[in-house]
Amino acid sequence: MQYNLTRIDPDAPNEQYPVGERETVTDQLLEDQVHKNIYMGKLEDVLRGAVNWGRKNSLWPYNFGLSCCYVEMTTAFTAPHDIARFGAEVIRASPRQADFMVIAGTCFVKMAPIIQRLYEQMLEPKWVISMGSCANSGGMYDIYSVVQGVDKFLPVDVYVPGCPPRPEAFLQGLMLLQESIGQERRPLSWVVGDQGIYRAEMPAQKDLRREQRIAVTNLRSPDEV
């Protein structure tokens, strides 16, 4: 039986089959066909990409809140916002089963050791989102009993501003965390030794959107938003 494979657009110059019926075959054509059928690269890059894809699309949050920002965080789990779209709807009651922790609310000095202990009980890889002005910098509580920013004792990956932030802001912070995880480079197993973790630099959204904000000329009143 003789047959020829054809593409959807057989008249395209680079999509004519079979190649053997052509009078001349350029090196570029052969190279294009090779790259379409053979992966040219490191298997390690493919493996890291697959692992990061699985990690960022299956983030299990630790069910833990401190203040009013926690109410806005839990609102993101309701149907209008549907955090399940990002694979982060599986709330865990134990830090050992969670992938990331959201510090949502005011962090008092008495609570800081407990938060740090809960963070240490989380298994690697783990991430932290600081949600709200109080968690970011102490907010309006510039007093001795409030920690002026949870990054003083925890490594924070994403800061979500607001007092309190809307659920949409929390979802944007979650998407930024997913973007950061997708670019991470960390050992695939602890067996190979401690090789450190590479995290890509994530510039502040305030700086990235500066030109966009300056370009706005028509400002609507609050009752029109």
From Swiss-Prot:
GO biological process: aerobic respiration; electron transport coupled proton transport
Cofactor binding, note field: Binds 1 [4Fe-4S] cluster.
Cell membrane listed as a keyword: yes
GO molecular function, one term: iron ion binding
Domain of life: Bacteria
Enzyme class: translocase
Family annotation (NCBIfam families): nuoB_fam, PRK06411.1
Protein name: NADH-quinone oxidoreductase subunit B
Organism: Pseudomonas putida (strain GB-1)
Organism lineage string: Bacteria, Pseudomonadati, Pseudomonadota, Gammaproteobacteria, Pseudomonadales
